[in-house]
Amino acid sequence: NSKDDNEKVDILHTIKEINLPEIIKYGKEKKVGVVLWLGINVLSEQLEEACKQYSQMGIKGFKVDFLDRNDQTAVEQVYKVAETCAKYNIFLDLHGMYAPTGYNRTFPNILNVEGVWGLEQAKWGSNKDDMPTYCVTFPFLRMMPGYVDYTPGGMRNCTKDHFVGDYYWPQTQGTRCHQIGMYIVYDSPLTMMADSPTAYEKEEECASFIASIPNQY
C-alpha cells in the first residue's frame, strides 16, 4: 500500500513476510473471507490485473483508501474502481472517501463508506474534541445520504478531560457501552471492530455482544 501518489508500488506482489495464499487457505478453513487494504491510486494503476488476480485467488473484497477529495476526476475514479471490482465479484469498503451520493445504489458491491470523522481521530486528537457529542449528532446528518463506516469498538476508554491522542495506544472518549451503542445506531452493513484482539480478549462480554449484533435489521 502507498499513500504517496508518486511512489510506484506493484500491488500484484506482496512483501515476502506475507504468505497470502496460506492466509486465504486458513481463512477458508475458518469460514472467514480475506479483504485487502489498498490505496486507491495504486489500485487504479493496475486495476484490471489486480481484480482478476485476487478474485481468482479467493479475495472477497478491497478496503480502498486515501481518495480524500470529491472533484470530477476523483468521482470518475471511484466509479471505475467500483465497476471493475463488480465485474470480478469483489466488494468494496471505501475509506478516505466522500459521503455517498448514490454510487452505493449504482454499485451494490460497495458495502460501506467512511466519509466521516471516524474513531481513527483518537490517534491524533485532543481533549478539545468532543467526540461523544459528535457521535450522537452525525447520524442525523451524515447518515442521511447512506451508510457509514465509523470503525467503532474502542475498549480503552476515558473521560473527555483525561483524553490524550496516542497513535500507538489509542483510547476513546466515553464508555465501552457508548462504543457498543454505535453498532446498533449506525447503518453500517460491513462494520469493523477497530481495537486489537487482546483488547477484546480482556473485554470478552463486550466483544461477544458486539459480535451478536446484526449488520442489518
PLM features: residue spans?
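Short, well-ordered loop/turn and helix-capping segments at boundaries between secondary-structure elements
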Residues: 87, 113-116, 185-187, 191, ...
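Aromatic- and carboxylate-enriched substrate-binding clefts and catalytic-loop regions
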Residues: 2-171, 175
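Catalytic domains of carbohydrate-active enzymes that cleave complex glycans
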Residues: 169, 178-197
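Glycan-recognition and catalytic regions of carbohydrate-active enzymes
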Residues: 193-217
